[in-house]
């Protein structure tokens, strides 16, 4: 499979906003933000980043790939845990500088490395004048120790 090549974005704003060529606007590190939701119920699952290779692989294979900023490498989401993300729809915003993936999650139906369905399992509240985190989704779909050995 040959890698997709993305053309440079147009300087013409209307070309970015209309139908036609998909010309993603990667940041100065070569990344684009990816928002990921469940294709069935719309729950926000995660926010990640993609480089051109990850975006191309995602489009070509229908399986979500990302670029790990902390590890500095490409990663196929769910490759270790079995919680692969099958992409049902990809959208971009008006500036083509963010991607929205609607996915179905295989395996344990978990997206977060903590074993939860979503990476957004905590709320931020103000307690005694201090911002604090409260867990609102404590249901583990898998044990990270068993899957990752951590």
Curated annotation (Swiss-Prot):
Q: What class of enzyme is it?
A: hydrolase
Q: Cofactor comment in the record?
A: Binds 1 Mg(2+) ion per subunit.
Q: Got any disulfides in this one, which pairs?
A: none
Q: Which biological process, per GO, is one annotated for this protein?
A: L-histidine biosynthetic process
The name this protein carries in UniProt is Phosphoribosyl-AMP cyclohydrolase
- Any matching Pfam family: PRA-CH
The record's function comment reads: Catalyzes the hydrolysis of the adenine ring of phosphoribosyl-AMP.
The residues the record assigns to binding Mg(2+) are 93, 95, 97
Keywords annotated in UniProt: Amino-acid biosynthesis, Cytoplasm, Histidine biosynthesis, Hydrolase, Magnesium, Metal-binding, Zinc
Q: Per UniProt, what is one GO molecular function of this protein?
A: magnesium ion binding
Instruction: Provide the taxonomic classification.
Output: Bacteria, Pseudomonadati, Pseudomonadota, Alphaproteobacteria, Hyphomicrobiales
What is this enzyme's catalytic activity, as reactions? 1-(5-phospho-beta-D-ribosyl)-5'-AMP + H2O = 1-(5-phospho-beta-D-ribosyl)-5-[(5-phospho-beta-D-ribosylamino)methylideneamino]imidazole-4-carboxamide
Sequence similarity? Belongs to the PRA-CH family.
Annotated Zn(2+) binding lies at 94, 112, 119
Primary place of residence? cytoplasm
The scientific name of the source species is Rhizobium johnstonii (strain DSM 114642 / LMG 32736 / 3841)
